[in-house]
Each structure stands twice: as structure tokens, then as C-alpha cells.
Design a protein with these regions (language model features):
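RNA-contacting regions in translation and RNA-metabolism proteins
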Residues: 1-46, 56-79
Length: 79
């Protein structure tokens, strides 16, 4: 498991009511890695946040951490 995947999983589990249902899938490309986050429908609002602020903050963390390894990380939140 990559460090970014583990980071996203820990953040998401801390936010939701059903941490056992959090799934993170990693799709790696040459320069970009897509992290797909799946949570229960009831927890979707907690991960996205009001006006997308929580999702934006998570994306910012992934972007900052990705600079260290010279890779771009994209977060997709799925049901």
C-alpha cells in the first residue's frame, strides 16, 4: 500500500460514521495517480463537506504530499 493511499484512507476513516466501509483504489499512470475513494452514501456529505471544502482540503494535502515524490495525485470520490 502506498503512503498516499494510506494517508487518504486514514483521513476518510476519521471523517465517516462507517470507517469499515471506506475503500481506496489506486490507479497509477506515468506522472499522475488517481485515488478513488468509496464511502457509503450516508457518509458522502461528510467527505465532501459544505460547498466541497473538506474534499478541497483533502486534495490540497494530497497535492502537497505529492510534490515530495514529484507526482500528481487526483482524488475521485465515488459512491
Amino acid at each position: 500500500m502506498s503512503a498516499m493511499k494510506a494517508l487518504l484512507e486514514e483521513i476518510a476513516k476519521a471523517l465517516v460514521d462507517s470507517p469499515d466501509d471506506v475503500q481506496v483504489t489506486e490507479v497509477e499512470g506515468e506522472q499522475t495517480t488517481v485515488l478513488e475513494l468509496r464511502v457509503r452514501t450516508e457518509d458522502l456529505g461528510k467527505v465532501i463537506g459544505r460547498q466541497g471544502r473538506t474534499a478541497r482540503a483533502i486534495r490540497t494535502l494530497l497535492s502537497a504530499a505529492g510534490m515530495k515524490v514529484h507526482k500528481r495525485f487526483v482524488l475521485e470520490i465515488l459512491e
